[in-house]
Regions:
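Charged/polar interaction segments and conserved charged motifs
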Residues: 1-2, 151
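Conserved N-terminal subdomain of the carbohydrate kinase-like
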Residues: 2-113, 117-125
Length: 166
């Protein structure tokens, strides 16, 4: 009888880490782990809080670390079954994410991109049209995209219409 278990599925979560607030890697990591899937994290930034509800937050951009982490995983032969990306700290990080995908994603890796940038008709703090353009270029790399209504309108170049959406 063979008692070996199949290898654990692994998702790379590429997202910010907000110290306070129900968002970012603080939510993704436990949810992914609870499904029995290993969550391998590449943080894009560390914030004291998320930017939507709080003011005066601290912010550390981790752009310089993203590719280093991906290259390390590549060197040691880490298999990534899925990628989930969320908040990016800058438009330049969209290009870093594309390079990270080149490094860690196999042809059969499911890539889910959440273009986190806006809600209720407005961009989040420190985000503008440059970020939207960067996401437009990046989304061609995704198998699945998960914009909210505001993000979908911005990405499509359509006006946001407030109200109840289904």
């Amino acid at each position: 009888m063979d008692n070996t278990l199949p290898p654990l599925k692994r998702i790379a979560a590429i997202h910010d880490l907000s110290g306070l607030g129900k968002c970012s890697l603080t939510v993704a990591l436990p949810v992914i782990s609870a499904t029995g899937v290993e969550c391998a994290c590449i943080p894009t930034a560390v914030l004291s809080t998320h930017t939507g509800e709080f003011t005066g937050w601290t912010f550390r951009d981790l752009s310089d670390d993203m590719l280093s982490i991906a290259h390390h995983w590549q060197r040691i032969g880490v298999r990534i079954d899925g990628v989930y990306s969320g908040y990016l700290a800058s438009p330049e990080q969209a290009q870093l994410l594309a390079q990270t995908l080149d490094c860690i994603a196999a042809p059969d890796t499911l890539v889910v991109i959440d273009p986190v940038m806006a809600d209720n008709g407005s961009y989040y703090s420190k985000i503008d049209d440059r970020m939207c353009a960067a996401f437009r270029r990046l989304l061609s790399r995704a198998d699945v995209i998960t914009p909210n209504v505001t993000e979908a309108a911005l990405l499509a170049g359509l006006p946001y219409e407030p109200g109840t959406h289904s």
